[in-house]
Amino acid sequence: MPFMILLPDDTDGSSSSDWITAGIGTSSPDTALVDDNGDTSYVKCNDDNEFMIIDFANPSVAEADIESITSVQFLSSGRSSDRRSEALVDIAFQVPSGFEESCSYDAHASSHETINGTAREVKPFGGAVWEYSDLENLEMKCTKDGTEEVYLGYLALKVIYEQAVSADNATFFGANF
């Protein structure tokens, strides 16, 4: 099935100040989280209950080219900076709200661990199927759980969809063969 990846493109300004952007060429969390490059660029936090809200880019596939949306799933990569204890982050859909999952990133000196969320076939609260307009306003909220410092290096959304079938009704009459 075809899929597209939606990357962070902004923060909504309501993030707490304790998520710090670090690394080369980054000035905000959305720029730090767009590629899975380990410790080259990332956001970090070690304060319990601190959060950041990330807005995602609009779909790269036109609405007319999508018959239906099969699922939406977050993809992430991170690590604990403590060599003995994992670091916990709760990742949830902010818009539409719901579907929170806890990610426990392993303790490691430099390697980031990939943790992907559950592929969600329906929207939170109500169970309605995903619509294209839902993809145009997606936000995720990351909340630090505990005080072990976490480095979050990648956050994206994978959207699996059914491709629209275009009918080939263009019959050629009067063609000169």
Regions found by a protein language model. Name each.
Residues 100-129:
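Extracellular carbohydrate recognition and processing domains
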